[in-house]
Structure formats: structure tokens, C-alpha cells
Amino acid sequence: MKTKQEKKARPGSIMRLLWSSHPWLTFFTLLTGLISGVASIAVVNVINQAIHEETFQRQSLFWFVGLSVVALLFRNGASLFPAYASMRIMTRLRIALCRKILGTPLEEVDRRGAPNVLTLLTSDIPQLNATLLIMPTILVESAVFLFGIAYLAYLSWVVFAITISLMILGVAMYLLFFMGGMKFTHKVRDEFTAFNEYTHALVFGLKELKLNGIRRRWFSRSAIQESSVRVAKYNYIERLWFTAAENVGQLTLSLLVGCLLFAAPMFAVIDAKTMSASVLAVLYIMGPLVMLVSAMPMLAQGRIACTRLADFGFSINEPHPEPETSDADNVLLLDHKKSWGSIQLKNVHMNYKDPQSSSGFALGPIDLTIHSGELVYIVGGNGCGKSTLAKVFCGLYIPQEGQLLLDGAAVTDDSRGDYRDLFSAVFSDFHLFNRLIGPDEKEHPSTDQAQTYLSTLGLEDKVKIEGLGYSTTTALSYGQQKRLALVCAYLEDRPIYLLDEWAADQDPPFKRFFYEELLPDLKRRGKTILIITHDDQYFQLADRIIKLADGCIVSDVKCAVEGKRA
């Protein structure tokens, strides 16, 4: 079952993005570009008139200075003013893309892999920004070029015909080389995504790399070095194609000037004044033409960025409104959190593909009901589906078949966000945020309460509360980071706690404290607790033990009360 987020969006148009976001500023850019174009060509005409004047004319000097100033001011205005608009547009798109990622189903993000998603933010958005910044310049130079062509037509149709013919030939040759370079533009982007994956491994696998020389040498040579060489090679070949394409422009200019000087007189009688004006105009408009030609790779890269973003379901031309929240909805949600009775998985199936390999995993059919206040252990061998089941249960993974029910009502796309708010979780691949988050967005947890939890979990000497954050989240052992993650979960104070092999990295005394003191305390406070664990010596403390094998529940056992009290 495909979700809404998985649908591919239309790539969109960068020019339409600029117009829809700031129509008046875009119109102003076009208008000033036209004025700059007219003034620039008028300067060429004044120069030509001055060349053929027999005596110095003060009026020509005034026209030359005045028109040059007008052309310069309007060209700069048309280029600089939209930079502010571009900045605002890109800020909005960055925020919207982050919200899009937050709203994308977790299984879709996992399927794509973190490096691919990060490349959207670190490569595609900056590339789109660079393209957007060059758009005003393209508009201005296009205006200058078009007025230059019109001026040539005004001077002589023969000159105009020769110019257009050679330019069409030059553009055709340019596109031939340009398309060759575009093949490598795609390769550069794909290889950069792979390089992002290696840099991620470099940072987070540094300990393993330092400990093993064979792995370190393999990683340095076969991974980082080879990927870097491929990025450089594809960049170089791409640059060769694009440079060859740009050189076509210089060749076209030389041919064009030669044809005007030596071939045009064969077809028509052209006086010296018209010929000099034509050559001056051609030389003048070649600057904008070369700039437009040079901008094509940037435009192409921006188009690729739009396509990659659209593949993720993010179109730059679609509205991206801020999420709306209602105080009344929050009150109803909080009331419901206090009174929920059961959560049911009904004939749930979930097919999951490992993003790191081609292997897949199937969960289901799963039929399971969890009641409020239960302490449930989820057990089974590695790879049996415990973590996948947990993510389905808390609403992070959307079942491809079957239903997730809260008090008999199906959890839908509209209610899934509220449903997830029932949970505080510490997964095996958890991430610590340096911010105190309480149960209510309007009320921050007290620092005294946070300090009490730090003391309870033996972190009072390692972590201090500073403002609304922690003094550190990184200068801790992995086991201590897990304890701090549990402190965060305590402060959230949600009805359901989901802990994925939390005790696996704790020392025996603290592991015992966790099972015999912390979990019973949470249960006494009315919390529902789901524990993924391998610690069979504490199984007797659970209300229920659910065992999984090959993605299916093979047993669901209720533990005797007497056994737990013994």
C-alpha cells in the first residue's frame, strides 16, 4: 500500500517559484532588465555615431555617459534586489523540506537510507539556491541579448540573417557537448550520495577504524579514496564537456565577425557605418550570450535538484503551509491520553526491506492486544521482528495490511500524530536531543525534577541541567547515554513507555535496579511498559511475555502474580 508521502511530485519550475513567491519583485527585475537592455544597445549606437563623426560632439559624450550609467544602475538593481527574495525563498524551502522529512513515513526514510535524505539538504537545496540566485542575471542578460538581436535586424537584414544562422549552428554544437556533460552531472550527484555514506561511516565508525588496521586501510583506500577519485573524475569529465561547449561560443564569435567583415559584402552593399555598428553590436551581445551559455550547466544542475526533491515527494512549486494546531484539539488529546484502555493490532502485515542490503523482512500476520497498565516483555532471537513490531505498535511504521486500533477505533493518517504522542520510547539506535521536553508543549519540566531523575539514574556527577538543556549529551559512555535517554522519556511523562533492549548496555547492578525498581515504579504510576529484552532471568517480573520468531507471534504468556512476588 503506497502512502501519500511516497507519491512522486512534479519537479516544478524555478522561474515559476520566483514569480509565485515574489511577483512584484520578479516584474521589477524584468522591467529593469528591459531598461538595461535598451540602454546598453543605445550605448553601442552612440559609440558607432561617435566613430563616424568628423568632429568632437559634446552631445554624444553626454549621451554616452548618461546611457552607460542608466545601463549599469538598472543592471545592478535587477541583479541585486532579487537576492533578498532568493534568500527568503530558500529559507522557506529548507524549513518545508525538514517538515516534509518529519512527515514522511519512517519506513520510507529507512528504505531510502540516511545518506540519500541528507543529500537532499546538504547538496540539492544548496544547488537549487545557487540556481535561484543566478536567475535574475539570466533575465537581465537575456533582455540585453534580445535587444541586441533586434538592433542587428534594424541595421541590416543580411547581417541579421548571417548572425542568426551562425548562432543556431553554434547553439546546436553547444547542445551536443552540453548533453555529454549532463550525463556526468547525474553521475557526480549519485557518487556524492555514496561519498556521504562513507563520511557518515568515518565519523560514527571511527573507533572501529582505529582499532583495526586492515579495516582502516580498506576504508581509506577502497571506500574514501576510490569514491573521492570517482567524484573528482566525473567532475573533471563533466567540466571537459562543458568547457568544450563554452569554447564553441568563442569559435562562433570568431566565425561571426569574419562572416560579417568578409562574407556579408558578397550578398549586399553595406556601408562602413552600418558594418561597424553591426560588428560592435555582435561583440557587445556576445558577452550576454556567453554568460547565458555558461549558465546552462547551473540551470541543469538546478533542474536535477528539483527532480531529486520531487522523487522524494517535494515539489518546489507546491504551497508549504505551516502546520496548524488547535488548543481545543490538544485538550481533547490530553484527556484521551489519561483514559485509553487498549491498543490492538489486527491481522497486521508489514514487509520491510533493509536499506543496507537487498534482503527483506516480513512481519505478520500479527494479532495482539495490549491493555493499559500492563508490563509486557517482547522476546525472541535476533532478526525475528521485535523492533519492527515495536515501530508498528507505536505508529512509526504504517501497516501495509491490517489495522491498528486504539480503544476499538482505527488509527488513521489524521489521528496517527496524536496516537504517537501516547509513547515515550528509547530505541536501540536512539538519538539524544539537548533540550528538556515535558508532557505539555506549554509547560517545561522543572529543573528540580530533571535533576532528581539524573540522580536516580546515577548521572548527577556526569550531567548538569543548564537552562532548558543538558551540560552534555556526548561525553558519556553508551550505557550512560541510554540512561540520559531514559531521563528524557521520564520527563515526557507519556502513558506508554517503549524500551528497546535498554538494559543491554548496563552493568549487572544497574540492570537489576532497572528491572526490579525502575519498571515497577513506572507501573505503579499507571504507565504501560513494553520492553524488548533478552534478559530471561527477569522474565518472571512481567505481566506478559510475547515471543516472536520469523516475524510472527509464537507465544503470548501471562505470568503468575505469585511468581512475580517470589
UniProtKB/Swiss-Prot annotation:
Keyword Oxidoreductase part of the UniProt annotation: no
Coiled coil spans: none
Keywords: Antibiotic biosynthesis, ATP-binding, Cell inner membrane, Cell membrane, Membrane, Nucleotide-binding, Transmembrane, Transmembrane helix
PROSITE patterns with a match to the protein in the record: ABC_TM1F, ABC_TRANSPORTER_1, ABC_TRANSPORTER_2
Residues involved in ATP binding: G380, G381, N382, G383, C384, G385, K386, S387
Residue intervals of the ABC transmembrane type-1 domain: 22-301
Transmembrane segments annotated in the record for this chain: 24-44, 61-81, 132-152, 158-178, 250-270, 279-299
Ranges of residues in domain ABC transporter: 343-566
A Pfam family recorded for this sequence: ABC_membrane
Compartments where found: Cell inner membrane
Membrane topology category: Multi-pass membrane protein
Main location per the UniProt record: membrane
Family annotation (InterPro entries): AAA+_ATPase, ABC1_TM_dom, ABC1_TM_sf, ABC_transporter-like_ATP-bd, ABC_transporter-like_CS, Cyc_pep_transpt_SyrD/YojI, P-loop_NTPase, Type_1_exporter
Molecular function GO labels: ABC-type transporter activity; ATP binding; ATP hydrolysis activity; ATPase-coupled lipid transmembrane transporter activity; peptide transmembrane transporter activity
Domain of life of the organism encoding this protein: Bacteria
GO cellular component, one term: plasma membrane
UniProt-listed GO biological process terms: antibiotic biosynthetic process; peptide transport
Function (record text): ATP-driven efflux pump necessary for the secretion of syringomycin. May specifically bind syringomycin and translocate it to the periplasmic space. SyrD is also required for full expression of the syrB gene.
Summary of subunit composition and partner proteins: Dimer.
Family: Belongs to the ABC transporter superfamily.
Designated name of the protein: ATP-binding protein SyrD
Protein source organism: Pseudomonas syringae pv. syringae
